[in-house]
C-alpha cells in the first residue's frame, strides 16, 4: 500500500464525512519528514478543513461539496512541487526559494520549471541550520572540511539549500570527508550515534528532530555568517538572515545567526478555485486553532501570510477569499 493511499484511509476513518464518501472530493497535501514542521503544516490544514466542514454541514447532513484531506509524509519541497506538476498532489508545502525557482525556471537541474505553480499562503520562517555533534570541533563553515556531513535526501529542501550553500562557497561534496543522504527523520539518530559529524536542516524553530540531537546528545547549531552567505542574502529576495534565540534548545547558550526562507503552501493553476477557496477559508477562519498546532506557527499574521515568501502568483481561489475578507 502506498504512503498516500494509507494516509487517505486513516483520515477517512476519523473524518466526520465517512458517511458521505461517495460525494466527497479527495485531495492531498505533500509535506515532509514525519518529524519535521512541514508534516505538522499539512496535518494542521487537514484538521482545519475537517473542523470547518463539520461545523457547517454536520455529521448527518451531508453535502455535495465535502472534501476529504490527507497529508502524507513526502520527500519535501522539490518533490512536492514535482508531484503537484504531475497532478499527483493538489497542494504541497515548499520552501520559498524552491517556489521561486520552480515558477521562474531558474534552477532546472534542481526543480523542473513549472509556470502553472500557484501560491496559496506562507507559513512559518525556516532558518537553515547546521547542527554539529558534540566533540566534533566544528564551530563554523570552514571547520566542516573533512567531516562526515549529511546533506539531506534528494528532493528535499534541505538538500537543495545545502547544494546552494556549497556552490556559493565554491566547493562540492569532496570538501567534506564523506557525505550521506539521510532523511530528516534519520539524521539526528545518526549524529548521536557518531555516524555523522553534522547535518544541515531547513526547518521551523523549535523542532523535535533538532531537539533529539541537541537535548539528547549535546549537539549544537553553528553560526553561518560567511561572506558567501551574506552575498546569497543580498542577491536573492527569498532569503533573509534569521536568528535562533538563546535558550531554544538545551545547548543554545547564545543567539545563533544564520539565513533562511519561508515555508509556503503551493498548488497548481489546474486545481479548482472552489477547493483552494475552501482550504484557505478553513485555515484563516480557524487561525487561532491553527497556531496552536505547533510552536513555529505562534506568530502567524494573516497580512504577512498572503505576501511574505510568495513569488508565484496567488491562486484565484485564494485571492477571492482574501478580497472578501479585506486582506487585499
What kind of feature is each model-predicted range?
Residues 3, 9-20:
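C-terminal segment of classical bacterial N-terminal signal peptides
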Residues 22-95:
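N-terminal (or domain-start) structured segment
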Residues 24, 66, 76-79, 86, ...:
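Extracytoplasmic
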Residues 26-58, 126-193, 288, 304-308, ...:
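Bilobed "Venus flytrap"/periplasmic-binding protein-like clamshell domains
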Residues 89-124, 204-208:
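Acidic, polar ligand-binding/catalytic clefts
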Residues 96-98, 106-107, 136, 172-266, ...:
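Pocket-lining segment of extracytoplasmic ligand-binding domains
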Residues 147-164, 237-307:
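Ligand-binding clefts/hinges and TM-proximal coupling segments of bilobed small-molecule sensing domains
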Residues 186, 193-194, 203-217, 221, ...:
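An extracytoplasmic/periplasmic, membrane-proximal ligand-sensing/linker region
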Amino acid at each position: 500500500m502506498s504512503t498516500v493511499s494509507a494516509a487517505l484511509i486513516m483520515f477517512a476513518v476519523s473524518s466526520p464525512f465517512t458517511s458521505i464518501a461517495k460525494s466527497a472530493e479527495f485531495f492531498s497535501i505533500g509535506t515532509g519528514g514525519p518529524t519535521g514542521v512541514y508534516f505538522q503544516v499539512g496535518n494542521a490544514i487537514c484538521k482545519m478543513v475537517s473542523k470547518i466542514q463539520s461545523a457547517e454541514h454536520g455529521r448527518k447532513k451531508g453535502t455535495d461539496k465535502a472534501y476529504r484531506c490527507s497529508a502524507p509524509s513526502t520527500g519535501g519541497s522539490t518533490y512536492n512541487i514535482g508531484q503537484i506538476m504531475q497532478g499527483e498532489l493538489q497542494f504541497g508545502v515548499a520552501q520559498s526559494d524552491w517556489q521561486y525557482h520552480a515558477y521562474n525556471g531558474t534552477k532546472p537541474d534542481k526543480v523542473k520549471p513549472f509556470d502553472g505553480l500557484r501560491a496559496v499562503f506562507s507559513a512559518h520562517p525556516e532558518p537553515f541550520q547546521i547542527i554539529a555533534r558534540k566533540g566534533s570541533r566544528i564551530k563554523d563553515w570552514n571547520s566542516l572540511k573533512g567531516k562526515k556531513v549529511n546533506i539531506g535526501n534528494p528532493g528535499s529542501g534541505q538538500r537543495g539549500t545545502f547544494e546552494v550553500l556549497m556552490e556559493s562557497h565554491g566547493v562540492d561534496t569532496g570538501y567534506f570527508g564523506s557525505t550521506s543522504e539521510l532523511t530528516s527523520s534519520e539524521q539526528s539518530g545518526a549524529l548521536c550515534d557518531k555516524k555523522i559529524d553534522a547535518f544541515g536542516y531547513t526547518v521551523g524553530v523549535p523542532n523535535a528532530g533538532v531537539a533529539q540531537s541537541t537535548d539528547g546528545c549535546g549537539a549544537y547549531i553553528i553560526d553561518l555568517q560567511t561572506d558567501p552567505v551574506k552575498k546569497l542574502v543580498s542577491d536573492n529576495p527569498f532569503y533573509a538572515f534569521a536568528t535562533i534565540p538563546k535558550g531554544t534548545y538545551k545547548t543554545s547558550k547564545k543567539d545563533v545567526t544564520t539565513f533562511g526562507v519561508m515555508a509556503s503552501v503551493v498548488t497548481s493553476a489546474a486545481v479548482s478555485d472552489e477547493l483552494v477557496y475552501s482550504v484557505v477559508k478553513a485555515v484563516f477562519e480557524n487561525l487561532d486553532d491553527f497556531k496552536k498546532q505547533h510552536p513555529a506557527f505562534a506568530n502567524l499574521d494573516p497580512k504577512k501570510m498572503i505576501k511574505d515568501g510568495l513569488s508565484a502568483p496567488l491562486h484565484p481561489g485564494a485571492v477571492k477569499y482574501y478580497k472578501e475578507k479585506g486582506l487585499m
